[in-house]
Amino acid sequence: RTGFGTFGGSLKDLSATDLGVFSSTAAIEAAGITPDQVDHTFFGNALQTSADAIYLARHIALRSGIPDEKPALTINRLCGSGFEAVVQGAKEIILGEADVALTGGTESMSQAPHVVRGARWGGLRLGPASGQFEDLLWGALTDTNCGLSMAQTAEELAERYGVTRSEVDEVAFHSQQRAKTAWDDGRFDIEVTGVGLRTRKGETTYRADEHIRPDTTVEGLSALRPYFKDDGLVTAGNASGMGDGSATAI
């Protein structure tokens, strides 16, 4: 996998496809196979932010050296898209349709665009925009069928199942500490591949999980205000972060 960049962080200028190529080429090398041995590519991508998102799995496969006659499929099962890619790859092998499958998931939330609905059909005129200006990222995080965002859903579930703010903050705290320990102990060395970046200072290699805050404390978390409800439990400290990254398994 790549390291995971925070929202608007070090990986913001790389598309989800770009990130998928980094993890896929590294996985092929780690597995000790050649690209032409891959029979099928399955890649999960929930928020289709790259310009070539419609071709994502295909482009990752081609750019990873997999021959163009080998099929590829992009999967959207929301947060489970990468897991579903692994499931589909395993099914192909079980059914005898493939011996080797390249599977994974990739997202670039930082590259989610703003769009103007109706602009194609004359929705834009001189002066104030008459089209509907829309944040594709914020829209994706809200289920219009029920009118709830992910965080609001968390608040509903917490109330239903009696989850407390202190319990949620404890989980967030231990998550941060475990992530730091894993990095300090070298547990991620075998799985995290470097991502080459061009900066104003020249070429550099990114290899980190940018969203980790090892100085997080329970006291600091408990001092944060709830974001969606005055008496709620979802805060900037215990909610899942938005970010960019990719992971691949052969």
Question: Model regions: which residues?
Answer:
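Conserved active-site "lid/cap" helical segment
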Residues: 1-46, 50-64, 71, 153-165, ...
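Conserved catalytic cysteine-centered active-site region
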Residues: 11-14, 41, 45-100, 133, ...
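Beta-strand segments within the central parallel beta-sheet cores of soluble alpha/beta enzyme folds
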Residues: 36-44, 71-76, 101-105, 167-174, ...
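Flexible glycine-/small-residue-enriched beta->alpha junction loops
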Residues: 100-156
